[in-house]
Amino acid sequence: MLKAVSADVSALTGKKQAFLLQVLPDGKLLVAGSDSHGTAYGIMELSCLIGVSPWEWWADVTPEKKTSFVLSAEYQTLQSPSVEYRGIFINDEDWGLYRWSKNNYEKERGNFGPKTYAQICELLLRLQANYLCPAMHDASMAFHRIPENRLVADS
């Protein structure tokens, strides 16, 4: 596909989790990543450019409606992380996240599981993070005890 659009993505070579957003001479927008994380981060960066907050779900930040979105013909950004591991540690989840999720979001499970972790993993992608130390208190059940959690995290 890259040959078909005559795009030079050599700047991505040798970089981990890097992405390139570039308006091509024909006006098409190229989103390319050095790996799957890089590609996802590029898509999420585009989402930020159009006004979607990484916290849109968690903080009820509704994106402002726009009638159009335009990037300049010269637009190009190449980004790669300067820190290898970037992420979050879910600590003391039994005081907040666990109770909220079991009472509001995953009532059928009575715990938090794949639906909640799907939102956590999306937030990680939106924040260009790659590391999650999941919940493990007895109240919330350890991450690995619910097989669907891993499927969500790997997708």
Q: What annotation goes with each model-predicted range?
A:
Residues L2, S82-S155:
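Aromatic-lined carbohydrate-binding surfaces of glycoside hydrolases
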Residues M1-S80:
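Contiguous, structured surface segment used for ligand recognition
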